[in-house]
Amino acid sequence: MKNFVIFLIRLYQKYISPMKPRTCRFYPTCSQYSIEAISKYGLLKGGLMSIWRILRCNPFNPGGYDPVK
C-alpha cells in the first residue's frame, strides 16, 4: 500500500504538477516531502506528517527549508 501511494504521488509530480504554477513555499516541495515521510515513517505517520505539511503550505506561512526529521 505504501508503494502504491508513493507511485500516485510520483504520477502527480510527473503529469499534474508541471501544468500548475510553482506555489509550494517549502523546500523540499510538499510532494517530495510526502514521499520522504511515507518512505521513512510508513503510511500512517508519514501520511499524517504530509497532511500537516500541506495544511501549512499557504500564503500566511513564510515556508523555507523543512526536511523530514
Swiss-Prot record:
Its main location: membrane. Transmembrane segments: none annotated. The keyword Cell membrane applies. GO terms for cellular component: plasma membrane. Belongs to the UPF0161 family. Could be involved in insertion of integral membrane proteins into the membrane. This is Putative membrane protein insertion efficiency factor. It comes from Caldanaerobacter subterraneus subsp. tengcongensis (strain DSM 15242 / JCM 11007 / NBRC 100824 / MB4).
